[in-house]
Amino acid sequence: MSQRVKIVNLLPELLGTYGDQGNVVTLSWRLSKRGIDNEVINASAFEKLPADGDFYFLGGGEDDAQVAAVELLRNGALQSALKNGAQLFAVCAGFQLLGESFPASNNRTISGLNLLPIKTESASPRSVGELLCESTLPIGALTGFENHGGQTKFTDRLQPLGIVQLGNGNHLSEKCDGAVTDQIIATYMHGPALVRNPALADYFLNRHGDLAGKLNEIEDSVFKKLHAERVAATK
């Protein structure tokens, strides 16, 4: 790829509660290890959100921050980027706000961005703990940590990211986690997810048309060891 790859970390001051920015760091690292020029753009709430990124990231956050974030994202920059071939990775609150609606404080229901056919409602008990899935993608087991009160249901046909082996995932009764479309991978997995799951990180990078099939193997044994340790810890 001749041009610099742009990784856009959307609204980190609002959606950066659980250290999910580590996903952005690991994407940049994996590109740099392959000699692929890249830059991370921390797109602040006080700036115009860029529409020319290659990869976008939405992290987790608290209720009021999530509401503020979805209002800022209604400006269409993310939507335009996805239409132009960008890829989005979204975690927890970032996952929820991509749907039709999600719950907020004071019993409010907030309209989402309608980028995914999902709806999230408040539920009890809160889902907290290790989350282990078998991915629906050809990358094996996925490991992470979930911490969410919302329960997410699909409102139309949609591929989950993983089938839950341990934990709750999207919904207490449905035993799946996240969602996958041509432009979006979403999950409830913190960890950060792309640090714990190097195969998922490379799969995500490979989805961009300019990078597909061009990612050579790299020395990342420390991340593969972390993945194996976290999977083994759930057994």
Name each region found by the language model.
Residues E13, F46, K119-E121, G150:
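Short, solvent-exposed coil/turn elements at secondary-structure transition points
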Residues S2-Q3, N9, S122-K235:
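Amide-donor transfer/coupling interface in amidating biosynthetic enzymes
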Residues M1-K83, V195-K235:
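N-terminal beta1-alpha1 cap of cysteine-dependent amidohydrolase-like domains
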Residues E62-I139:
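Cysteine-nucleophile active-site neighborhood
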Residues L11, V91-A93, L116, H148, ...:
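A secondary-structure boundary/capping signal
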Residues F55-G59, F89, Y188:
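Structural motif
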